[in-house]
Amino acid sequence: MPELPEVEVTRRGFAERIAGARIDAVRIGKPLRWALMVMPEALVGRRVLQVRRRGKYLLIDLDRGLLLLHLGMSGSLRFDAALPAPGVHDHFDLVTELGTLRLNDPRRFGAVVYVEDEAAPWAIKLLGGLGMEPLGDAFDLDAFHAGLRKRKAAVKQVLLAGDVVVGVGNIYASEALFLAGIRPTLSAARISRPRAARLHAAVREILARAVEKGGSTLRDFSNVEGQSGYFQLEATVYGRAGEPCRVCATPIRLLRQGQRSTYYCPNCQK
């Protein structure tokens, strides 16, 4: 599933290129997770003002209303002035005077939803429960520690939940916990402020590094140019079960948490 780094890489790939463009047509393919919530022709003639990101959602601001776009489990976007005819997995085209933004989503768990503003019921439903943005100034250490202290679940599960901090997917949670020296099974409520500070910094560092590397391509992800990310090639623990830790040489262990694979070093992480 595309996580925060992949969504941010996607946003940066087309945001400036589509800004100011007039919408000429909207094509809808097979049904996605949620309906568009507006007749496609109602968007024709409107202009794209900017593209923002909130967690794993892209917010495409129009001169009236906005589109909330989620890539789902397997989605990716392309933006080009001359795209080929839509393929079997191309389910949404936003055709503008500057190019077409196309959503390819084989599993169809993604969605594009129109709302009038961020106070609209669907916007609140999709965005209202999201935690802090980890890459901006709003990622406050005190609030982060307080959020952890309220949760008795394993810290990795809390990171994945998205209501304390958004966008920390499975690979990034494993990597951040290793960098912070925290065992993924430790109850979040037991994390002291100094350890929370290390994890806070580690989450920032890992996600920023992942964006710099173009995200991670574990299965389907590619950016708007069709290129894969390569952060996963530099992972310190993720995908390395049985291999020696790069710090202490202890074999990396694999366990299952909530149906997700967790990788950690039993010596470096306490």
Swiss-Prot record:
**Positions with a binding annotation for DNA:** 89, 107, 151
The record's keywords, sorted A to Z, are: DNA damage, DNA repair, DNA-binding, Glycosidase, Hydrolase, Lyase, Metal-binding, Multifunctional enzyme, Zinc, Zinc-finger
Q: Which GO terms describe its molecular function?
A: 8-oxo-7,8-dihydroguanine DNA N-glycosylase activity; class I DNA-(apurinic or apyrimidinic site) endonuclease activity; damaged DNA binding; zinc ion binding
Entry-linked Pfam families: Fapy_DNA_glyco, H2TH, zf-FPG_IleRS
Query: What cystine pairs are annotated?
Result: none
Name the Enzyme Commission number(s) assigned to this protein.
Answer: 3.2.2.23, 4.2.99.18
Is Isomerase there in the keyword field?
A: no
Entry note: cofactor: Binds 1 zinc ion per subunit.
| Highest rank taxon of the organism | Bacteria
* Zn finger (FPG-type) location: 236-270
Q: Required cofactors, per record?
A: Zn(2+)
Q: Which reaction is the catalytic activity of this chain?
A: Hydrolysis of DNA containing ring-opened 7-methylguanine residues, releasing 2,6-diamino-4-hydroxy-5-(N-methyl)formamidopyrimidine; 2'-deoxyribonucleotide-(2'-deoxyribose 5'-phosphate)-2'-deoxyribonucleotide-DNA = a 3'-end 2'-deoxyribonucleotide-(2,3-dehydro-2,3-deoxyribose 5'-phosphate)-DNA + a 5'-end 5'-phospho-2'-deoxyribonucleoside-DNA + H(+)
* Active-site residues, Swiss-Prot/TrEMBL: 2-3, 56, 260
Q: GO biological process annotations for this chain's record? A: base-excision repair
Keyword Zinc carried by entry: yes
Q: Which family does it belong to?
A: Belongs to the FPG family.
Role of this protein? Involved in base excision repair of DNA damaged by oxidation or by mutagenic agents. Acts as a DNA glycosylase that recognizes and removes damaged bases. Has a preference for oxidized purines, such as 7,8-dihydro-8-oxoguanine (8-oxoG). Has AP (apurinic/apyrimidinic) lyase activity and introduces nicks in the DNA strand. Cleaves the DNA backbone by beta-delta elimination to generate a single-strand break at the site of the removed base with both 3'- and 5'-phosphates.
Q: Which HAMAP family match?
A: Fapy_DNA_glycosyl
On subunit structure and binding partners, the annotation says: Monomer.
Q: What protein name is recorded for this chain?
A: Formamidopyrimidine-DNA glycosylase
Query: Which species expresses this protein natively?
Result: Variovorax paradoxus (strain S110)
UniProt lineage: Bacteria, Pseudomonadati, Pseudomonadota, Betaproteobacteria, Burkholderiales
> Which gene name does the record give?
mutM
